[in-house]
Design a protein with these regions (language model features):
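Membrane-embedded alpha-helical bundles of multi-pass transporters/translocases
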Residues: 1-186
């Protein structure tokens, strides 16, 4: 029972952080593009496209984070098939978007962006159904003072730091790539 109390508190705090972080990025998307892809900012078409792509696809990060959380719960219950199958949903969604939706868009890349977002919702929906079937769907509460949360944060901080260094490197690559001419070898 204690582990489920922790999972519910973790789910609540995780949802809160994901929601507010996603909301902030969506609201400041042009600033976000200026910081992380400055080369796009001074080309009106590229800037508008980048802002639109960010606003359409950024929620996918929150959705896939919840899918990863669900996968962890399922793995602890010896259920490995669905977490392994989940990326296939993403691929199928993008293929369908590219083949069937792209021709109906003036700028076909929008179809792929919407395909990414739809894939995230489908992945999460399938995971929610699977967790309900095994009676392990967390019921998020917002108990930020749960003793397990502080212990969890202390244990996960080194992993976040290590992963963050890799992400910073990728962001720097993106900044430099955005400054190159279209079609430049990278």
């Amino acid at each position: 029972k204690n582990i489920y109390s922790f999972l519910n508190a973790l789910a609540g705090s995780f949802l809160s952080v994901l929601f507010f972080f996603t909301l902030i990025v969506l609201l400041i998307a042009p600033i976000f593009i200026f910081i992380f892809a400055p080369g796009f900012y001074f080309d009106e078409f590229k800037k508008d496209l980048a802002v639109d792509m960010l606003r359409i696809m950024f929620p996918y990060l929150a959705l896939i984070s919840l899918v990863a959380f669900s996968s962890g719960i399922q793995n602890t219950h010896d259920r490995f098939s669905l977490p392994a199958f989940t990326p296939l949903i993403f691929n199928i969604s993008l293929i369908i978007a590219a083949i069937f939706l792209a021709p109906s868009f003036n700028v076909p890349v929008y179809a792929l962006a919407w395909g990414v977002l739809v894939a995230g919702f489908l992945q999460l929906l399938i995971h929610i159904i699977a967790l309900r079937k095994i009676n392990r769907l967390p019921r998020p509460n917002f108990n930020w003072s749960h003793p397990g949360l502080s212990k969890f944060l202390k244990l996960i901080f080194p992993a976040i730091l290590a992963g963050g260094i890799i992400q910073i490197n990728l962001l720097i690559d993106t900044i430099f790539a955005s400054l190159l001419e279209t079609g430049s070898p990278t």
